[in-house]
Amino acid sequence: MEDLLYSFVVTDITSALVFVRRQTDALVYASLGLNKKQLLKGARTAFNQLSKKSAIHYNFKQIEVESEQEHVEKFQDTVNKFTKLLEGHIVKDLHYEYMFGTSLQHRIWDELVKIPHGKVTTYKEIADKLKIKNGSRAIGSGIGSNNIAIVIPCHRVVCSNGTLSGYKWSTSLKRKLLEREHVYASNKKDALNKDTKISLMKYKYSA
């Protein structure tokens, strides 16, 4: 059995459910949304599926961020750093690790982490970097499997023509996250949506 500490965080842009692995103090799961019951249900489903593969039972323990319980200082620090990220701040020392995903998905997520605040890249660019021929679909699937929102910044990946494409936690939230990072439509008078385009010349990240 393994303990996973969790807490809900609330910001003006959305709420989140955050899990930290007790034995490593690493962030291992973060999901976005306003419905706490649905967030917790999604987490239970994800960890139950993982449990079938790992043969480990994951024990959920809720910790309030302001709790004075012993041995939760590192947990609180991790949750506070995640909250700052969600609020649009740059945080460089948040400890996380992958509990989910395949080796290919881990490579994809590692590429996403390289995209800086205020920049975007495309599915094709990632496929080319990883040398996956015709790999945009595989990249999209890998991005959609990301279970650590914001820290693994899948909201910074767009289509080759600059349109937003989908987002696991809703396209409307993807727009808000990008605009918070000062990434706008080519015509700033237009709100970012599935039809407007981001200026890749201005915002695209090049390694």
Swiss-Prot record:
This enzyme catalyzes only one turnover and therefore is not strictly catalytic. According to one definition, an enzyme is a biocatalyst that acts repeatedly and over many reaction cycles. The gene is MGT1. Belongs to the MGMT family. InterPro entries: MethylDNA_cys_MeTrfase_AS (IPR001497), MethylDNA_cys_MeTrfase_DNA-bd (IPR014048), MethylDNA_cys_MeTrfase_DNAb (IPR036217), WH-like_DNA-bd_sf (IPR036388). The keyword Nucleus applies. This is Methylated-DNA--protein-cysteine methyltransferase. Its EC number is 2.1.1.63. Keywords: DNA damage, DNA repair, DNA-binding, Methyltransferase, Nucleus, Transferase.
